């Protein structure tokens, strides 16, 4: 498979630019730390939040298995997972669509004394030669790019024969999508028309007041949200221009060029499980997530 022509006209360029602008302004994970951005304390709090809430990630990613391997992370964000690969002894490269995330990821590695290479790059047009990497990892990123199928083809191209991809996409069959977003958030959207309603939704869901007010302002300015817009803004915040969900069948189809594909689901958004969500032990949470988890992990071997 040949490398894409970087000079070719991209029909999704306008949408991709809006995606880039959103994440440039809101680097993923920054809202989970109130420490000064770019400090050691800032990164420590981001990491504690990530692996406290999404405690399955170290298990699912199996960072230690990448020792001595060339690893590419597509959408490295703040470098939180990237740091785990580097600590495990991987030859790590992280790319992101935004300069803001790359700058923060570099700072995180610098503070921790870790080695890694970083560059701004587009998942749909990777600037790497064929068969460069042993592992390609991407957590919660490719459902935000306009042509996800093209990005997956790029992963296949740059992987060595026998190389493996680990990709997380939002799961269409999840409780979070079918109930949390399509039912509970839709019902709650009507309450956002008043300050009292905003406070009710805040108490019921734990969603920050400022975030709910931003959702309300956007809905009022746009005259409501289409189904696609509502999904996008219900996943990663008000103003998020693009997010998609995938069924297991759709995920398998995306990775059809790979020799072997395995799917696993993780992570229940327990805020949307009334009364008992916060009380669930991890054993039950894991069992439920295996069927209805929000994060659909695709393990694909070239």
Where are these regions (language model features)?
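A short acidic, Gly/Pro-enriched loop at the edge of an enzyme's catalytic core
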Residues: 124-135
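N-terminal, positively charged/glycine-rich alpha-helical extensions of SAM-dependent methyltransferases
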Residues: 1-48
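A short glycine-rich, Lys/Arg-flanked "PGG" loop and its adjoining helix->strand segment in the class I
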Residues: 149-161
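Core SAM-dependent methyltransferase catalytic element
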Residues: 259, 281-302
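Class I SAM-dependent methyltransferase SAM/SAH-binding core
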Residues: 66-125
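Conserved alpha-helix/loop element of class I SAM-dependent methyltransferases that forms part
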Residues: 37-69
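Conserved class I S-adenosyl-L-methionine
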Residues: 164-220
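Short alpha-helix
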Residues: 240-265
